[in-house]
Amino acid sequence: MLTHKTCQARKKMQVSFVIRDAEEKQHRNGVNSLQLDPNNGKLYSAGRDAIIRVWNTRSESSEKYIQSMEHHNDWVNDIVLCCNGRNLISASCDTTVKVWNAQKGFCMSTLRTHRDYVQALAYAKDREQVASAGLDKAIFLWDVNTLTALTASNNTVTTSSLTGSKDSIYSLAMNPSGTVIVSGSTENILRIWDPRTCMRSMKLRGHTENVRCLVVSPDGNQVVSGSSDGTIKVWNLGQQRCVQTIHVHKEGVWSLLMSENFQYIISGSRDQNIIVTEMRNPSNKTLVCEEKAPVLSLGYNMDKTGVWATTWNSDIRCWKLPMYDRGTLNSSGGLDAQWTQGGTELACIKGGAAIKECTVLNDKRYILTKDSQDQVVLYDVLRVVKKDTLGPIDYEAEVKKRNKQVYIPNWFTVDLKTGMPTIVLGQEEVDCFSAWVSIEAGLPECVDPTTEIKINYGKLLLEALLEYWTPPHSIPQNELEPDMHGNGYFQVPKHTPVIFSEVGGRTVCRLLVRDAAGDSECTLLHETAPQWVTDVVIEKNIPKFLKIPFFLQPHPQMTKPERTKKDRLVANEFIQCRKVCEHVLEKVLNAETTPSGANANNSLQNSQSDGNSEGSQLPAEERIELSCNDVVVDPNMDLRTVRHFIWKQSTDLTFQYKTKQNFNYDGSIGDSLERVTRKY
């Protein structure tokens, strides 16, 4: 993979991945742009799910899918076919412009010149020149032949820039000969450049809101623009003014398509209508169809008798275009002109459902989602899989049903922008290493009854995602033993995309789990992976434990309290309350204790009888009762859960203890729980 890099300081990084199927044949969100190859009938669609898909429009069956082109990790905003259909250029919210082999579907190179979302592309067919523009107010010109010739040894590319824009650019257009380039922005004006000299020639005022779409006539003399103000304007560049304003939509105009003779305008709007209008006589118009959502993009079908349309929804539909029949001479000497009937749906490429709602369950391992078709699905974040499809059930009731009374710190966030669940791991507001749990709770299928192990969700997941990454020059600690990869418990799907990106910024690296073993991918990971990732994946360091301070004092009902003052202790936050009970018996009451799950007879066979031997064989939690805020605490609860659900205060947690039976005890308060917890 070739990368056009700019020099910049190392920034804070995050790691994200997408829970998805190995092959996603349907768009899972809106479709922003279309390109039809008239040579073979292939339709290219740029999705908000970050995927470009290719369809066979000549197929009579409902199965038109050919392949997916994947390397972006955010909305693909625009695409253009070039080099007679051999290559495709794409622009994305991930701030990159990518060059693709359109026939084989792989990414040839990535251009990282833009500093913000890349919103629009323009193509001059006769010159094989592409322009890109976006929210960074910049316009760059690219020579397509140079881009497609990039290799591993020849990876330097130069670009010309068009300066002067003062606001974010949302639309861009060029004529085929590349003599005129026009941009539209939130500045509400059109700026015109000569791309041959990179000089700005004029700016045109008239729109009152963002200019969302543009078309330049083949001769470069006229421009048609659509705006969020609901109008379509026709501009004469020679006269440097608007010569016509067309009002046919009730809301913003987001897409324009012109007839070959530049006489008819087909427009798609936020009002969900597609309308065809005669440019010279705007009153001569007709409705093509009413879509089910705001219209994002339009494109002709093969014989230009219909128009493909995309919307906020994931379906792509082809509608029959009405034709204007100027009619015959009537008795009064006029013409009986009329539109032929259009609006028939000629074809439909069905899309999939986009996830619209998501809840992270209290166990911080599973998420529950609801999509645009009201289907409720359970995902396992740790194993990166869809766990269960529950159907169109009551979402809120299911969340309530599945939420347990357990508190585990947030260790990931969920992004639904693409319509699929993207899980984000980082070290900023949410620490991905904050979730320590017992293996019994986190991975019950891996429990060894003879051990009590704590696992860290973030560490296990990063080790699984980067299981195949072996850094250059790595040497096993023991050459007689093989290198240990992964986390030793489970693997994640090998098709999972893993993305390294700057926090709140640009993508640095994207790869699939299975590809991390490649030489180039290993080198790229070595250069881009943040230190907090290499610490756990390569160095095998253990994330630090988070500790909780708390007070321990006798309950007022204690018959013979050892002392009345509170003692301040510190312990790992995942320590269960049964350990506090053991501490009370061992260190406060100096009584013998049987660890939970141990054989009482074996552990106490050498202990002296004190008259309470039968009681002393019971686990500590059956001999000591802990309470917090006058609520008896479940010994299986950990300290952080008690603090979150019962204590509910910002001050240090306070426990009261009392015996469930009368025991003989003497001695003083022992060491703090700091020492006790080290062995658990």
From Swiss-Prot:
SMART domains: WD40 (SM00320). WD repeats lie at residues 26-65, 71-110, 113-152, 164-203, 206-245, 248-287, 290-329, 350-389. One of its GO terms (molecular function) is ubiquitin binding. InterPro entries: G-protein_beta_WD-40_rep, WD40/YVTN_repeat-like_dom_sf, WD40_repeat_CS, WD40_repeat_dom_sf, WD40_rpt, WDR48, WDR48/Bun107. Catalytic component of the Usp12-46 deubiquitylase complex consisting of Usp12-46, Wdr20 and Uaf1; regulatory subunit that, together wtih Wdr20, stabilizes Usp12-46. The Usp12-46 deubiquitylase complex associates with arr/arrow; the interaction leads to deubiquitination and stabilization of arr/arrow. Belongs to the WD repeat WDR48 family. This is WD repeat-containing protein 48 homolog. The lineage of its organism: Eukaryota, Metazoa, Ecdysozoa, Arthropoda, Hexapoda.
